[in-house]
Every structure is written in C-alpha cells, then in structure tokens.
Amino acid sequence: MAIAHLATEYVFSDFLLKEPTEPKFKGLRLELAVDKMVTCIAVGLPLLLISLAFAQEISIGTQISCFSPSSFSWRQAAFVDSYCWAAVQQKNSLQSESGNLPLWLHKFFPYILLLFAILLYLPALFWRFAAAPHLCSDLKFIMEELDKVYNRAIKAAKSARDLDLRDGPGPPGVTENVGQSLWEISESHFKYPIVEQYLKTKKNSSHLIMKYISCRLVTFAVVLLACIYLSYYFSLSSLSDEFLCSIKSGVLRNDSTIPDSFQCKLIAVGIFQLLSLINLLVYALLVPVVIYTLFVPFRQKTDVLKVYEILPTFDVLHFKSEGYNDLSLYNLFLEENISELKSYKCLKVLENIKSNGQGIDPMLLLTNLGMIKMDVIDGKVPMSLQTKGEDQGSQRMDFKDLDLSSETAANNGEKNSRQRLLNSSC
C-alpha cells in the first residue's frame, strides 16, 4: 500500500506545476502580432526610404543643377545652385513650365516621410505607456490564477485517489459510479474561483478597449493621409522637375551682366518618385490590415479558456463577450501569450485524450494512469526491500569471511606450536 501511495505521488507530481525560481511570465507580449507587424512596416519603411534618399544625396553631393553662363566662375555657379535650392519654397523667385507647382515638396520629401514615421509610432508609444503596464499586471494575475485552478484540480484528483486507496475496493455498485463519486470531494479545493469572477467583471469594462480602438483609428487616419500625400506627390513629380530661377535681388537687382533667369533641374526627383511609389503601394496594401485590426476584438474567441472547461466549476460559457469590451481584448492577449501558460499545455493534452478516448473524463483517466503504474511497481521487488536484502546478504558474507579467517588463523597457530615442540624434543 505504501508503494501504491508513492506511485500516485509521482504521477500527480509530474502534472502539478512547480513554482519557478525565476520570475514567472517574464516575456509577456503586450502587443498583438498583427498590430506589431503594422507598426514595424508603417514606421520602418519610411525610415528605410529616408536612409536611401540621404545616401543618394551623399553620393551625388547636390540636389539641384542650374545652367549658368560660361562666363561664370565655379564659385558663381555654386552660388546660383545654392540660391535656387534655397528659393525652391519661394514662389516669387520661381517660374515653372507647368504652372505654379509646389516644388518645395521635392525639397522636403524625406522630412515629410520622417514626419509620417513619427506620427505612426505615436499610437504604439501611447499604448506602451498608457495601457501596457495595467495590461501586464492583469495578464500576470489571470495566468497565475489559471495555473492555480489547474493545480487545485490536480490536488483534488490526488485527494480523491488517496481516499480510494485508503478505503480499499468497494462493492460493484460503487465502482460503477466511480466517475461521479470521484469529484464528490471537499469544496475547499474549488472555493472562490477568483479568476472566473475577475474575468466576468471585464465584460462591463471598456477602458482598455477604448485605448486600443483609439490607437488603431489614429494609425488608420495617418496611413490614409500618407496615401493621399504620396499619390499627390507621385502625380506632381511626373509633371515637371524643371523651373526657372531668378537671382536678381539685393545688390544684384540692377546688374546687367546677370541673366534674368536660370534654367534649373531637381536631380533627386526621379529617385523620390520611385521611393514615393514604393511607399504608396505598401501603405495601400497596409490599409486593409489596419481596418482588420479594428475588428479583431469583435471576434468572440474563447479558445484558451474553453480548455479549462475540463476542470470542475469553471464555466467558459459565461465568458462569451458581446461587442467591444475589455474581455474580448483579454481573450486575444491570452491567446497571444499562450506559450507562457503552462497549465494550458497540460490541459490540451488531457483534452486530446478525452476527444480520442470516447468521452472518458481526463481526470478519471489520470487516476487510472496512476493505478496502472501502481500495479507495475507492485509486480516488481521494491527497491528499498531489495537494497535491504542486499545489505543483509553482504553482512552475512562479511561474517562468513571473518569466521573463515579466524579458523585459518587458529589452524596456523596449532601448526606453529607443534613445530616448536618437535624442535625442542630433537
């Protein structure tokens, strides 16, 4: 009976979750995978294009080229280029062949992309500091309590199994209802399921979901605005990148040796046009994904909590959320951090056994597993008894060796005394 009790201890200790020495739930993901993907693409792509634009500027050295007369020195030609580059945003000094076009958009194109990258990162920054700390503490509490619910169920099965082992085999009528009597145990194991009550309170809360929806709406608005700007810039750059620039101002106003205007061309417009097209296509593909993130919390998914229906007193039907509330968002984040939830893995195994075992209760199957191991151990010689027998056998062998050595020493002593007597008689 002691060996059977020890075997049951080993079975349930394997399933019982151990308390880790390091902090639990260290790598919680506080951002959904689809939101993280949108942020990385929406912010990372403009930064990549900006780096390419500045690399092109460094390799070429200048962003504008103006046709100066041959009588101008290289310093005068450089002055014309610098003056016309600085006057791009001034309409009075410029005359374009295609009319009054805002040519300053070409000059500030990389900086506008940088502005969009900053605006698209603001929702992620707001979520990190305004919502993530509260979400992290709630998720740690919920996941820890779910593990405790699982541990209490295992302890209940263990206590029920110990009770059956102490009582011994019952009459046939009792063994038929063993599946029902197994859970007729003390309510102290399942009293006050605080995680269930806490999750139900999230159905009436909407603080977290409002922050989430606000972040997604801001992201959608900025991406849509960026698409409009990039479309306009692409159409603008395809019209003309050449203009006439006049440098007659100040002391040069009345200088007759200086032409009235210079023909100038923006060199980087072709590169900017290609970069704007790439960014526009990616953002256009990103718009449906951003719209999808707005409706992600509306999915009524309780797959993670549904596994816990195996345990007593845990009813997942009460966790069906309707509309947008915090509970729908917590379900998504539990699914996102499912790798950190150890009890889910164990219960998933038991659920698979239940589905393939013709409706067998997983906890009952677990106790049967303990009985099978108990029978196997009973069929063998216990290790403690075997070692004890080996110790006794070794002690007996030591005593036999001592007896043999003492007999040998006595015989040798007799032989020595006889030899001395013979020598003295001679």
Swiss-Prot record:
S-nitrosylation inhibits channel currents and ATP release. N-glycosylation plays a role in cell surface targeting. Glycosylation at its extracellular surface makes unlikely that two oligomers could dock to form an intercellular channel such as in gap junctions. Exists in three glycosylation states: non-glycosylated (GLY0), high-mannose glycosylated (GLY1), and fully mature glycosylated (GLY2). Its main location: membrane. It comes from the Eukaryota. This is Pannexin-1. It catalyses: Ca(2+)(in) = Ca(2+)(out); ATP(in) = ATP(out); K(+)(in) = K(+)(out); chloride(in) = chloride(out). The chain crosses the membrane at residues 41-61, 107-127, 217-237, 278-298. Homoheptameric. Residues 62-106, 238-277 are extracellular. The modification Phosphotyrosine is found at Y198. Ion channel involved in a variety of physiological functions such as blood pressure regulation, apoptotic cell clearance and oogenesis. Forms anion-selective channels with relatively low conductance and an order of permeabilities: nitrate>iodide>chlroride>>aspartate=glutamate=gluconate. Can release ATP upon activation through phosphorylation or cleavage at C-terminus. May play a role as a Ca(2+)-leak channel to regulate ER Ca(2+) homeostasis. The record marks D375, V376, I377, D378 as: Cleavage. Residues 407-426 are annotated as: Disordered. Keywords: Calcium, Calcium channel, Calcium transport, Cell membrane, Disulfide bond, Endoplasmic reticulum, Glycoprotein, Ion channel, Ion transport, Membrane, Phosphoprotein, S-nitrosylation, Transmembrane, Transmembrane helix, Transport. Expressed in the eye, thyroid, prostate, kidney and liver. Abundantly expressed in the CNS, including hippocampus, olfactory bulb, cortex, cerebellum and white matter. One of its GO terms (cellular component) is plasma membrane. Disulfide bonds join C66-C264, C84-C245.
